[in-house]
Every structure is written in C-alpha cells, then in structure tokens.
Amino acid sequence: MQSKLHVDKVITTVNSPSAAAHSPLAASWRRSATRHGHDPSDSRVAERLGQTDVECHRERLERFIRVATPRLDLLFGLVGLSGCGVFLTDDAGLVLDRRVADGDAAAFDGWGLGIGADWSEASEGTNGIGTCIAEMRRVTIHRDEHFFVRNIGMSCLDAPIFGPDGGLLAALDVSSARVDQTGAYNRLIGAMVAQAAQAIEADFFRASFPDARIVVADSDNIDGSVLLAVDGDDLIVGATRGARRTFGLEQKGALKLRPASDVLGRADGPVGFEKAERAAVIRALARAEGNVSKAARGLGIGRATLYRRMKRLGIGE
C-alpha cells in the first residue's frame, strides 16, 4: 500500500505543470522521469562496476582519496555506531570508498550502496548522492523523498566537494536505513557531513599547492572553504570555489595572475618596485634580528650597499 501511494505521489508531482517551479524535490523527480526515463515502481538494484573498473576510477582520484581518508574515518567514528554508513563518490556518483559497521554491511549491500555502485540521478533517480551532484549543493533526501519506491527506506545526507580548479570533484554521503531517524537527527548529521566535506576540500586544496602560502579569507560563505594560494611574488596561483565566488575570480579552471593585495584590498602588499624592495629589506633585517651584515649576506649584497638602500628607503638601522 505504501509503495502504491509513493508511486502515485511521484507521478502526480511529475505531471503537475507548476510543482517543479516551486520545489527542488519536485524538479528532481521530474528530471528523473522525463530526462532519465525512470519509473518510480522499478525494483531493479543499482548496477555495480567490477573491481578492475573501480580501481581505474580510484586511480584517477588516488591522491584525493588519500587526503580524504582521515576525515572519512573521523566522520564514521561519529555516526557509525548509530547505523549510518559513510560513502565517498566521484563527480559522476560512482561509490569509490565507504565506511560501514560489519553488522550493517549486508544491509547496505542490499540497498545497493556498495563500492562501484552508480548513484547518479541518471541511474537511481532522486537520491542524496545523485541530486547533490546534479544540483551541486548540500541535500537531504529523507525516505519517501527518493524517486524509486525501492529506496524510500533510506535517509541520505550529502555535500559536494569541489576541487582546486573550482569544478565538482566528489560527493560525501552519510546514509541510514533506520526507521526512527528524525528530521532533527538528519539536520545534525547533515551539519557533520557539510563540515567534513568542507574540511576535505580545504585539505586537498592545501595539498595541491604545497609551496604556496595559503590565505584564509573572511567571508559569509558557509558552503565551502574560502582559501587562496599565493606564491612568493604575491600572485594568486590557486583559489577554492568559495574564494572564486567571493572575490569574483574565474569560476573554473586556471586563474588569471593577480597580486593577492589587489584581490584582498590590502595596501601593505608589495605593490610597486620601491615598495617591494622595502618589504624585502625589512624581511631580511627581521630574519637577521637587526644585524645589517647578516641581512646583507642574506640579500646577496654588500653591507655598504644595504646601508645606502636603507637610507634611500627610509629604513632606520
């Protein structure tokens, strides 16, 4: 009876001329039916790739998965005892890594949440992973919000993870089949998922620019890290998706070279040759703890030359 009611509700919503315009969930249901040709009563289980194919996909994201692993372990430590599983997918919704308790593994396998399973909307209709990827935002798909009737026993909470190029890289999912999982509990877990996804994004960004100075910028953006990678010449060489949006930079791909001081609106960066030279001399003196001879050696110039530059630049000994 519940199955029939769900199918009828989905079909009615899909056929409504206005529902999709007023509800993101209804819009996803319509995509599932009209764009992907799904029938909500379809009972087939999600398809899974073989181990060899999965390894090929994992190799493409090997460095990212290695960076993400500690955060996945930490998240599972927080939610695993409550019957939840933690899943990491690529940008196409393919499950590449998961954390589930031994006692829950069979249940998640039965739901089709195994390594190599395709949980894109094209494969599974409206669901946490696929809809998160399709809309590139945090989503919660609770039980009968799923498109397929076979998935209405689950609650899925997801957040996207964006790469250093600003493009979608992966999705982080926590799923549960507990019948007593409430909306309040979902909000709590959803906040944990979002925080973990943001931490993974920041960790991978830092790992992608090991020789750069990472600037954490102030922003009201709560959906992603706002980080800039700045090289030794004060040029921005990398920016997270949140930083790209905050500072009006290129949304994806390579960045046009810009001084960080221009973007951050600071007047104390090395703007102009004289200012850059003055900053370099002051840094050298600071490193030498005020010893002019040592500072001169660090700059590769003579002591007398450094004195002349200090006088010209208005730097007291």
Regions found by a protein language model. Give the residues of each.
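PAS/PAS-like sensory domain cap-loop motif
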Residues: 104, 108, 247-254
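Intrinsically disordered, low-complexity terminal regulatory regions
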Residues: 1-123, 127-148, 153-154, 162-165, ...
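Short, Lys/Arg-enriched anionic-surface-contact patches
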Residues: 262-276
